[in-house]
Amino acid sequence: INLASLSEAHGEGVRPLHGHFAKLSCIAPLERGASGLQVFTQDWRVTRKIEADLRKLEQEYIIEVRGETTPQALERLARGATRNDRELPKAKASWQNETHLRLALKNPQPGQISELCAYLRLEVRGMRRIRLGGVSMGKLPLGQWRYLASTERF
């Protein structure tokens, strides 16, 4: 994160200062192999708040997959399903297009998104987090960042 990668979409009156880039910590890290929305802060209060609420915050992913599944299997995810005698987390799933699955769930643990896709008999080719709670990436280009708008809340 640096001044050069600040998105042009940012325009809300926060003037970037060099001190804004010191001692940043990443909260709510991405699943291994995923890209997309990450949250960085210097404020310990923000860190504490998000870490305390992380279990309740819904996270939304767009997953590039290969394969086909049934609408009934997608509906089963919303009620909860089991795979290999393990309970899978409840998740809202829908097709964005033929190769991209939209998945929304709370507090995904490492490997759970891949496991949900395996339950659906889909092969994961890539995944991107697009939303964390009430904060969405919107049309933010890859590799760019922006400040949190004053109207946004996790």
Regions of interest found by a model, annotated:
Residues 1-154:
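Basic, flexible Lys/Arg- and Gly-enriched helix-loop patches that mediate nucleic-acid binding at interfaces
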